[in-house]
A protein has these predicted regions:
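A glycine-rich helix N-cap at a beta->alpha junction
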Residues: 1-13, 32
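Short acidic-hydrophobic, aromatic-tinged amphipathic segments that line or gate anion-handling sites
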Residues: 41-44
Length: 213
């Protein structure tokens, strides 16, 4: 409400926390934070995006920011920091497999790596897709309608992948979209086992996408 440049850095942002179990695994907090007015919630996918989100938070002089970071190790989505801050649009395309696109994959944080793997797997079955990294919903929502259409209005199926509560994504995926995430409390197990339990792994996601096409 005061419009101050306060930056909150939050870690251990999902079921990727693993063995500490559901008492320590946030499943509703991203949706809760995103519902707060005048707050930018960043969930970067790798080191490069973290740098860019940090820059945006520093430049946001009249609005507080949250930067939510994962605990587990993830592969980098990008390996080179360029002059143009790609996160400044809130969402951007990081991968396109083929020209005749059927699927748009939307992801944040640690699940962006998962979305990339899903896209590659789909391509082996001649199902072509693009992957959109969406590190900040609030910034994306402020973009022009033309930009939002370029990001969202391509292909026949929109799929969100995030290890969090899923209902928030429906405004992007629509009534016929597929929202994959966590709508229950977490589990205590190695994080890869938990992702598989909640069917947030490549094979399960690919099968769900194929059923919805």
């Amino acid at each position: 409400m005061m419009g101050q440049r306060v930056i909150y850095v939050l870690t251990h942002d999902s079921i990727g926390l693993g063995e500490d179990g559901p008492t320590h695994q946030p499943v509703e907090q991203l949706a809760m934070l995103r519902s707060i007015p005048n707050l930018n919630v960043f969930r970067p996918s790798d080191t490069i995006e973290t740098f860019e989100c940090w820059q945006l938070a520093l430049e946001s002089k009249n609005k507080p920011s949250v930067i939510a970071l994962t605990r587990q190790k993830i592969e980098p989505i990008r390996t080179e920091l360029i002059a143009n801050n790609l996160c400044s649009k809130g969402a951007y395309e990081i991968l396109r497999n083929g020209d005749n696109l059927k699927v748009t994959l939307l992801a944040t944080g640690s699940e962006t790596e998962l979305a990339v793997k899903v896209s590659h797997k789909l391509a082996t079955e001649n199902i072509y897709s693009k992957v959109i990294s969406m590190p900040c919903h609030e910034i994306f929502d402020s973009q022009s309608n033309d930009y939002k259409k370029d990001i969202l209005e391509e292909g026949t199926l929109k799929v969100s992948i995030e290890a969090s509560e899923t209902s928030y994504w429906k405004k992007y995926t629509g009534t016929s979209g597929l929202n994959l995430g966590i709508d229950n409390f977490g589990k205590s197990a190695p994080y890869k086992d938990i992702y598989k339990h909640f069917e947030l792994d490549v094979e399960n996601i690919v099968q769900k996408i194929k059923k919805n096409l």
